[in-house]
Swiss-Prot record:
Its main location: membrane. The keyword Cell division does not apply. It catalyses: Fe(II)-heme o + 2 A + H2O = Fe(II)-heme a + 2 AH2. Catalyzes the conversion of heme O to heme A by two successive hydroxylations of the methyl group at C8. The first hydroxylation forms heme I, the second hydroxylation results in an unstable dihydroxymethyl group, which spontaneously dehydrates, resulting in the formyl group of heme A. Keywords: Cell membrane, Disulfide bond, Heme biosynthesis, Iron, Membrane, Metal-binding, Oxidoreductase, Transmembrane, Transmembrane helix. It comes from the Bacteria. This is Heme A synthase. It comes from Bacillus velezensis (strain DSM 23117 / BGSC 10A6 / LMG 26770 / FZB42) (Bacillus amyloliquefaciens subsp. plantarum).
C-alpha cells in the first residue's frame, strides 16, 4: 500500500485526536466564547486577541479546519485505493466526512446561537464517532498490505462475543454522553469523594449536579465490569484470534486508565492534565470497540460468502 497514504492516515488520525482533545480543553477552560459570538472570525478578526480564552478557541477552530482538508483527502484516496481490498472502506469514508461536518456545524451553531448542556454533550459524542471513523479507516489502510499477503487469519466470532462487542459499543457511547453532560453542567466536582459522593447524607447525592455526577460514576462502573467480563471470555475462547484478544487487552487497559484519570480529576480538583487524559482514554476505548464492529461486519460477510 502507498506509503504516502499511510502517512496521511496517521497524520489525519492525529489531527482528529487533537481536535477531540482541543474541544475538551475548550470546555475545561470555559473558552467556548473566547472569540465571542462570531464564526469563523474571532472578535471580527482572523487572528485572535492575545488572551488565553481567544487563543484556545481559535486554535481549536484552526485544527478543525485543517482536519476537514485532511479527512476529505484521506477519504477520497482510501476509497480509490483500499476499496478493492476491503469493501467497508466506502462506508467508513462516508461516515468520516458526514460526522466531521456535523461536528463542525454543531460547534459553529453553539458559538453563534448558544446551546444547552444536552446539545453540547452530543457535540462531543459526534466528535468521538468522527475520530473513530478516521482511526478505523487508517487501520484498514495498514491492514490492506496484510490482506494482500494473506496474513490475516480467518475470523471466528461467536454470538456471545458479538453481543459483548455490539452491546459495549452502544453502552460506551451512552457513558460518554453522561460524562460530557457532567462537564457541560459543571458537575465534575459536585461529589468531592470517591466512590461515594461525600461524607454527608450517607454518601448519597442530594441535588441535581450530584445526581449527574453519581449517575455517570454508576454507568462507568458497570462499563468497567462488563469489559472485564468480555475480556475474560476472550481469554478463555479467543486465544487464537489475535485481533480479538489484542483488542480486548487494549479495551481493558483503556477502561482502567479511564477510571484512574476520572478519580484523579476529582482528587486534583479538575487538573487540566487529568481532565484531558480522561478524554484521551475514552477516545482510545471507543476506537477499539468500533473496530470490533468492523470485525463483526467482516465476519458476517465472509460467513455469508462461504455459504453461497
Amino acid at each position: 500500500m502507498n506509503k504516502a497514504l499511510k502517512a496521511l492516515g496517521v497524520l489525519t488520525t492525529f489531527v482528529m485526536l487533537v481536535v477531540l482533545i482541543g474541544g475538551a480543553l475548550v470546555t475545561k477552560t470555559g473558552s467556548g466564547l473566547g472569540c465571542g459570538r462570531q464564526w469563523p472570525l474571532c472578535h471580527g478578526r482572523f487572528f485572535p486577541e492575545l488572551n488565553a480564552a481567544s487563543i484556545i478557541e481559535w486554535s481549536h477552530r484552526l485544527a478543525s479546519g485543517v482536519s476537514i482538508v485532511l479527512v476529505l483527502s484521506l477519504a477520497f484516496w482510501a476509497w480509490r485505493k483500499v476499496t478493492p481490498v476491503f469493501r467497508e472502506t466506502t462506508f467508513l469514508a462516508i461516515m468520516s466526512i458526514i460526522f466531521l461536518f456535523l461536528q463542525a456545524l454543531l460547534g459553529a451553531l453553539a458559538v453563534v446561537f448558544g446551546s444547552n448542556a444536552l446539545v453540547m454533550a452530543l457535540h462531543f459524542g459526534i466528535s468521538l464517532i468522527s475520530f473513530a471513523s478516521v482511526l478505523i479507516l487508517t487501520l484498514l489502510i495498514f491492514e490492506a498490505d496484510k490482506s494482500d499477503k494473506k496474513l490475516v487469519k480467518p475470523l471466528r466470532i461467536g454470538r456471545k462475543m458479538q453481543f459483548h462487542m455490539i452491546g459495549l459499543s452502544i453502552y460506551t457511547y451512552i457513558v460518554v454522553y453522561t460524562g460530557a453532560y457532567v462537564r457541560h453542567t459543571k458537575s465534575s466536582l459536585a461529589c468531592p469523594d470517591v466512590p461515594l459522593c461525600s461524607r454527608l447524607n450517607h454518601g448519597l447525592p442530594s441535588h441535581f449536579q450530584e445526581w449527574v455526577q453519581m449517575g455517570h460514576r454508576t454507568a462507568a462502573l458497570l462499563l468497567f465490569v462488563w469489559i472485564l467480563v468480555a475480556f475474560a471470555h476472550a481469554v478463555r475462547s479467543y486465544k487464537d484470534q489475535k485481533q480479538i484478544l489484542g483488542g480486548w487487552i487494549a479495551a481493558l487497559a483503556f477502561v482502567v486508565l479511564q477510571a484512574l484519570s476520572g478519580i484523579m480529576v476529582v482528587y486534583s480538583e479538575m487538573a487540566t492534565g487529568f481532565a484531558l487524559a480522561h478524554s484521551l482514554f475514552i477516545a482510545g476505548l471507543f476506537g477499539v470497540l468500533c473496530y470490533f464492529l468492523l470485525l463483526i461486519a467482516r465476519f458476517r460477510y465472509e460467513s455469508k460468502q462461504r455459504n453461497i
